[in-house]
Amino acid sequence: MARMHSRDRGKSGSTRPPRVAPPSWVEYSPEEVESLVVDLAKQGYEPAMIGIKLRDEYGIPDVKLITGKKITEILEEHGLAPELPEDLLNLIRRAKRVREHLKRHPKDLHSKRGLQLIESKIHRLVKYYKRKGVLPEDWKYDPEALHVE
């Protein structure tokens, strides 16, 4: 399938092997993994970065296989879940960066078009998250009012 806003077909990549049980070489118990996730979240890491750190530094390939819960589910249980979903937050940050670029370079039409595409993705995601009940129905994307770091 093609990419959303271009005709590119993407690139091939390896797929993760389907596993039912955690690998035998993982030496962490579910409780230890859960506490690691909570500790990393308290240090300020986002869910995707927590997964990468656990994979690269602790040798934990898949949190869900070991604990039976996703990283965001663990964070929700401990009251550490981000208020906005991570993919939406990343798109909002990207739009903010492009908007700041356009303040300095107002004639950059390619970036203006890029901002339109990013904001289209934001609106599409907001609609999805409202439908799923993740965001409240009255939540609205307002680039000036939203303050994300």
Swiss-Prot record:
Residues 1-25 are annotated as: Disordered. GO terms for molecular function: small ribosomal subunit rRNA binding; structural constituent of ribosome. It comes from the Archaea. SUPFAM superfamilies: S15/NS1 RNA-binding domain. InterPro entries: Ribosomal_uS15, Ribosomal_uS15_arc_euk, Ribosomal_uS15_N, uS15_NS1_RNA-bd_sf. GO terms for biological process: translation. GO terms for cellular component: cytosolic small ribosomal subunit. The keyword Ribonucleoprotein applies. Residues 1-11 have a biased composition (Basic and acidic residues). Keywords: Ribonucleoprotein, Ribosomal protein. Signal peptide: none annotated. Part of the 30S ribosomal subunit. Belongs to the universal ribosomal protein uS15 family. This is Small ribosomal subunit protein uS15. It comes from Methanopyrus kandleri (strain AV19 / DSM 6324 / JCM 9639 / NBRC 100938). The lineage of its organism: Archaea, Methanobacteriati, Methanobacteriota, Methanomada group, Methanopyri.
